[in-house]
């Protein structure tokens, strides 16, 4: 029987983890990015923030070379510089966002209880994990989770409430009604949080200097069942193989993937992420591979190295389309 040995957890894949073990690991990692053990337990696990990227790789039948940057991130070989302006801003604003959310919840709900959490590991699939920003419960709604986002949006002098002029890419506006884009990575992230924590709703809360936006999103079992199939396949195809032969780790070089220290700055506006590796699209980088290109159809940005763009390709084409388009 195949075994999983992952950060001190060992046993047949079919056995899973006990409820007691899941709770102990959660308690031991409260504080999340301020807790070293949280980082340790994430390594080698597909966390909910990567669910969308993993699913896209499987559905689009990507080659191992294209999967490599994402796999490297999941295994903990590479990471994004936490001091990048957008990420630093998000960390600094999260306590304020949390306070604003809690005030809103207390006004419209009874017996509200908030609880900080660490990492939740799927008891049946210990290679899946999620870290909601907050665990929430109340007498009227039962048990849920909350996820906070703090995008860097400039102050708007035209809008008196949540700014519609510079809407974050993860929100959609349909006849004046805002909602989370169901095709965005954040939707997969919170569906994963609900599935792994065993809760049935998530308050998606967006904090900006122009006001706040909140949407309660319910668990979608059909969506998650489909997503989970992709996650299982990715684990069996790539992560198990990497644990066995360490081919990605052994092939590591200094410039692939790019060292984040070559970054001079990140654009002061919206921060874009490469759909393939989920890495940040950076400005003013020194190496050609670290540069990026925008698809002329879907308008998403991709790292040159992730889509195999060469100087010849750029010279010969007036337009460029990503593999999906």
Identify the meaning behind each predicted range:
Residues 1-107, 156-180, 248-249:
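Charged, glycine-rich intrinsically disordered N-terminal tails and low-complexity linkers that flank
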Residues 81-87, 175-179, 214-216, 284-290, ...:
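Short interface patches used for recognition in eukaryotic signaling and trafficking proteins
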Residues 94-97, 186-189, 223, 227, ...:
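Alpha-helical interaction elements in eukaryotic regulators
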Residues 95, 99, 110-116, 275-276, ...:
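Eukaryotic beta-rich interaction modules
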Residues 105, 109-130, 138-241, 245:
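Nucleic-acid nuclease catalytic cores
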Residues 223-224, 228-267, 323-325:
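C-terminal helix/juxtamembrane-tail motif
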Residues 258-325:
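PHD-type zinc finger and closely related Cys/His-rich zinc-binding mini-domains in nuclear regulators
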């Amino acid at each position: 029987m195949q075994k999983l040995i992952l950060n001190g957890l060992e046993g047949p894949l079919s056995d899973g983890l006990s409820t007691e073990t899941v709770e102990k690991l959660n308690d031991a990692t409260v504080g999340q990015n301020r807790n070293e053990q949280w980082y340790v337990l994430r390594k080698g696990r597909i966390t909910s923030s990567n669910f969308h990227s993993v699913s896209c790789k499987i559905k689009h039948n990507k080659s191992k070379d294209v999967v490599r940057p994402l796999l490297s991130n999941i295994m903990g070989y590479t990471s994004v510089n936490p001091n990048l302006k957008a990420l630093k801003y998000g960390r600094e604003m999260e306590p304020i966002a949390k306070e604003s959310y809690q005030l809103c919840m207390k006004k419209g709900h009874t017996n509200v209880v908030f609880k900080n959490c660490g990492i939740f590991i799927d008891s049946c699939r210990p290679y899946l994990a999620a870290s909601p920003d907050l665990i929430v419960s109340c007498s009227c709604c039962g048990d849920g989770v909350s996820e906070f986002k703090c995008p860097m949006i400039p102050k708007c002098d035209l809008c008196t409430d949540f700014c519609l002029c510079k809407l974050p890419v993860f929100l959609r506006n349909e006849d004046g009604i805002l909602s989370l884009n169901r095709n965005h990575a954040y939707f997969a992230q919170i569906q994963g949080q609900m599935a792994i924590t065993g809760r049935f709703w998530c308050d998606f809360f967006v904090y900006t200097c122009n006001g706040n936006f909140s949407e309660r999103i319910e668990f979608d079992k059909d969506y998650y069942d489909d997503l989970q199939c992709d996650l299982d396949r990715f684990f069996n195809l790539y992560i198990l193989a990497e644990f066995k032969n360490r081919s990605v780790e052994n092939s590591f070089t200094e410039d692939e993937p790019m060292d984040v220290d070559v970054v001079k700055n990140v654009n002061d506006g919206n921060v874009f992420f490469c759909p393939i590796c989920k890495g940040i699209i950076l400005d003013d980088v020194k190496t050609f591979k670290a540069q990026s290109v925008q698809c002329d159809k879907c308008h998403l940005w991709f790292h040159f190295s992730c889509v195999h763009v060469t100087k010849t390709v750029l010279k010969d084409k007036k337009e460029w389309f990503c593999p999906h388009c």
